[in-house]
Each structure stands twice: as C-alpha cells, then as structure tokens.
UniProtKB/Swiss-Prot annotation:
Family: Belongs to the conotoxin T superfamily.
Source species of the chain: Californiconus californicus (California cone)
Protein name: Conotoxin Cl5.3
Subcellular compartments: Secreted
GO molecular function list: toxin activity
Domain characteristics, as noted in the entry: The cysteine framework is V (CC-CC).
Keyword Nucleotide-binding attached: no
Length: 28
C-alpha cells in the first residue's frame, strides 16, 4: 500500500489504490 498516495501499488504490494484520477482511496 502506497503511503505517498500513489495510484499504483509498489513492488510486492496488493493493488489497493485506485487508478487515476481518483487516488484518495489508497490505504494510508
């Protein structure tokens, strides 16, 4: 889960973040 609000998950992370243009639902 991206802590920086990235729309895409980092390596080894689940795709919990929304795609553009909505990135506010990323797990914090």
């Amino acid at each position: 889960n991206s802590e920086d609000g990235s729309p895409y998950p980092g390596p080894g992370q689940q795709p919990n973040c929304c795609k553009w243009p909505i990135v506010t639902c990323c797990n914090r």
